[in-house]
Amino acid sequence: MNIQDSIDHVSDGNNLNQEQMTAVMNQIMQGQATDIQIASFLTALKLKGETIDEITAAANVMREMSSTVKTNKKILLDTCGTGGDGCQTFNISTTSAFVIAAAGIAVAKHGNRSVSSSSGSADLLERAGININLNPAQVAQCIDATEIGFMFAPQHHQAMKHAANARKQLGTRTIFNLLGPLTNPAGAKHQLLGVYDDKWVEPIAAVLKKLGSKRAMVVHSKDGLDEISLSADTKVAELNNGKIKTYTISPKKFGLTPCKLSDLKVENVDQSFAIFLSVLKGEDGPAKDIVVLNAGAALYIGNITKSLAEGIKLANKIIANKSALEKYELLKSASQKSSTSQQIEKKSE
């Protein structure tokens, strides 16, 4: 099925099977569709409602066309979420990644610059002095050496450029907003994945199952966060051994002090970086608590602890002994060395 036929098919309220969706996505990602065709298709798909099969097929095409980051790690975890929750908080999942890495889980962090927030993961890490423009081999070196590496989405998903204009002109969420966390270039099989709307919690968990993920938690809080929240209950769909169970996480249950969402908000990347550093240095407050909560969940799905409660305790210890701060310094140094070696290689050529 080509994209012209799919627009009519989807506009009439019909779903695409995986074979049909694969054909259309290949056409888009290979630059064989016009901006107006892409925009029409994405809009029709959104109005109909994207299905699990459609999202799975689209993610598989993106995975096939992305770069491949090959590491020596047996377990890789990602904390990339959909973003777009509109809450303007500091970079919770990115900060959590350093706590997770300090516990011994290799983190292949996938991310991008901000679209709707004050600071995207790439914006924060760049402000923190980390080189985000590494090629796949250099990212793999960072992960193997330091347990953490960052994959800047535009560097690894070159084919996405064919949909960029249509997406920009549309200016609304489409299936592509869901695909980023589903297309980790390192093939991470363990994920803590926040979504911008609770309607996607269970479907995205089902997509991860189809894509071969081993363990994952897909989350969305009642206050709108695509994270596990301190200020409201959070809906969770947990994937483990091919089975999905849905439940609610309440911060009070784990002895964490509830806070207002406004306590976590920032206006720019400088403010986000300041909070990032304060958390890694162990300064008490709601920012540290929400990082501990989310990192604890990742330690649980990364098989380091047997429960979320144990994960939270371990995350607290890691921050207290400054090992998460050390991970940040290690990645900063490793990424800069990779950048220097890349420049030397180019000069020698």
Regions found by a protein language model. Name each.
Residues M1, V10-T56, E64-T71, I290-V291:
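N-terminal glycine-rich anion-binding loops that anchor highly charged ligand groups
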Residues M1-N14, T79-D85:
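N-terminal basic/disordered segments at the start of proteins
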Residues H9, E64-S67, T89, G104, ...:
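Glycine-rich anion-binding loops and their surrounding alpha/beta cores
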Residues S11, L42-K46, D78-G83, A298:
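Short glycine-rich or small-residue beta-strand-to-loop segments that form or flank ligand, phosphate
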Residues N17, T34-D35, T51, S93, ...:
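Helix N-cap / loop-to-helix initiation motif
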Residues L42, F90-T146:
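A glycine-rich phosphate/pyrophosphate-binding beta-strand-loop-alpha-helix module
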Residues G49-G111:
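Active-site cofactor/substrate anionic-group-binding motifs, chiefly glycine-
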Residues G81-G86, G111-S117, H156, K222-D223:
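Acidic, glycine-rich active-site loops and adjacent beta-strand->loop/helix elements
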